[in-house]
Structures are given as C-alpha cells and as structure tokens.
C-alpha cells in the first residue's frame, strides 16, 4: 500500500484526485500545502525539490520509500488500488479514456469559463460563449453515456469518476446554475452520487452547487493582479503624472492572470494571455468588417440576411475563401470522436477568431464519414503559418483557395454556411456542423 507526502497548494482540485483515490484504497497520504512546510512558488523552486521533481510542478508525491512522481493523474493512479484502476484490461482502458477526456476536453473550456469568475483570468466574451457551448456538449455527452449507468466504468467508482468529478467541480460550484444544468439529469445524478460518497466528502466536504451563474468581476480581477513596483516620480507635467497610470494599464493587460499561490503552472499557462504582435498587422485596412457579418450570421436568417450581407460587403482583395478536407477519412470511426477533432482544432485556433470564420461539417455515419469546410481568412494566404500556435492541425487537411466570383464558391458558401443543400461533391449525408466565429 502506498504511503507518502503530497505537496500542493490549498484547495487544489488536481490534488483532490489523489486524495479521494487514497480514501478508497487506504493509501496513507500526508498533505503539505502551507508554510512553513511548503510554500508554493518558493519551496517547489528550491534545488532540493527540483532534484526530486524536475518540472517543479504540484501536486507532487514523495513516497516513504523515496519514490517520487509528479502529474496529478499519475499520482492518483499510484495511490489507487486495482478496483479504481480497472480490474480488467477493458475496464482499465476505459478508465484511461475518461481520464484523458477530462484533460483534453473538459479542462480547456472549464478554465476559460470559470477562471474569469474567480478573478484570475481576464474575460473575453466570445471565448466565454464558445466555452459555454463546449461545456454544454460535454455535459450532453456524459448525460447520454450515463443514461443506463450509475458510474462511468463498471458498477463501482473508479478513477474515471474521481477524475471527471474533480475536473467538473468548479463548473458546478461557480457557473452551472439550475437553468443550465437541468438539461443533463443523468450527469447531475451521477455527480451528486459521487460527491456524496463518504470518500469524496472526506476530501471535498459539502459541495454547494451553484445557484446563480458567477460573472466576471473586473474589480476583483484588477485586485488579484501582482502589484508592480514603480519608480517614484517627482512632481512634473500632467503628461508625466499620467504616464505611469497608462503603463500600469498595459501591465495589467499583459500580466499573468493570477498570483502563483492561486494556480499551479499548468493553470497559469492556460490563463496567461501575453500581449503579442498582431500577425495581420502588415495587411492594409479592409472595408469588410467580419464582426458585423458574424452578428448578422448569429442573429439573422442565414439565407435571406446573412449571406446577402456577406457577398455585398466581402472584400476579395483583403480577404480570401478556402475549402478544406480532412486528409484521413479512413481513420474516422465514431461520429462523436470526429466532432471532437473539429472542436479541438477550433479551441487551438481561438486567437484566430478575430480574423477568420468557418463552417466545418461532418458528413456520414459511424465508420463512414468525412470532414470538410469553408473558411474565410484575412489576407490572401492561409493564416496558419503566421503563428506556431495555429499550426497543430492544419496539415491534417487539404486546402484549396476559392475564386469568390465563381459559381463553385457561391454554392459552397451557401451550402456550408446554411448547412442546407445537395453537397453533391461529398457523397454523404449531412451529420452535424460546427461554426468557428
């Protein structure tokens, strides 16, 4: 049975995974989370700590036998028993599946939505709305899976349940008000069942579900930012007095989103939004206002209002149209997994939204599907090479530039933007679509 010390900071949801697992397995885990024994941001940067845990990340676990391991999922696995890990190869694979799903699909939108409400990340309206839709998709996926199941894998709690519950915890506490979560009764039932297990309660205490969706508080965010030392100024002109204030505003925009004591390094990376050079700054101004088209598209009828507006105002010199197809349709199996490919790409392209719009569609059924889309980009070239952050997915697609004046472009834009039409070039029925805006 594992025994050792867990280094973390207080109320770290990532550490909860290992602590709940230990409650089930009987592993003896001591927690060091506060001075003088452990000071996050200091202790974890000392040479002694880094010799044991080179990444300097928490949570980190040191066994009484000297064994050291970091990364919360690895620690939770180590302190678990066979029942939690999955007692058969199939069950173990499904546990890993849900643990991976929590990290790849739940953490990004949950962080984007929740962090601003806690004052540790600046609010971006479009990003938040996108995150809400992604959370809604995730809860729906879980709801369908749990319709005939008590737990995610098998008939007992496993690491799958522990991990996904902990990943959803702040969503349920901060933003999933009754009107939002009521559409997912099976997910809610499962979540409540888990958090009311004695082993969960021993770590989480009584979890109070959100009654009213928390909102971004600009004042709280400003107060949470690290205070910078500024040189003292002698009294001078009005411009000299105003300059430090302007500089402080810029520092707030570019600053890391929270003090080190509030987040681990992974969360700091998710929340940080450094001020960067605009990759499109070299392009001349355009008469086409993409945001206005997006408003038309979101709020008006696509065929009768949004598309006529698009073609009337589209600047073919300042913008370009592209058709894309996924290169490896033979690898597409379950349609929900194929949709995850699209959603994951959109998430990684989040900072491209101001200069792009797309409708990407999944056609076909399980084990016989394809993905293709129509994109609008600022400039005359593909935007992806302009930033390393945008280059993860695009090579998995073929790209063909469209002539805005051609009949083909008119047809593709109409069909893909409206999700209606024959789609004769595809040869498969429309399944579902995703909009990048």
Swiss-Prot record:
Swiss-Prot/TrEMBL keywords: Acetylation, Elongation factor, Isopeptide bond, Protein biosynthesis, Ubl conjugation
Transferase listed as a keyword: no
Disordered as annotated region, ranges: 221-268
Residue intervals of the GST N-terminal domain: 2-87
EF-1-gamma C-terminal domain mapped to chain residues: 276-437
Basic and acidic residues bias (residue ranges): 221-254
Modified residues (N6-acetyllysine): 147, 212, 401, 434
Domain GST C-terminal: 88-216
Functional note: Probably plays a role in anchoring the complex to other cellular components.
Protein name per UniProt: Elongation factor 1-gamma
Organism name: Equus caballus
Biological classification of the source: Eukaryota, Metazoa, Chordata, Craniata, Vertebrata
Gene name of the record: EEF1G
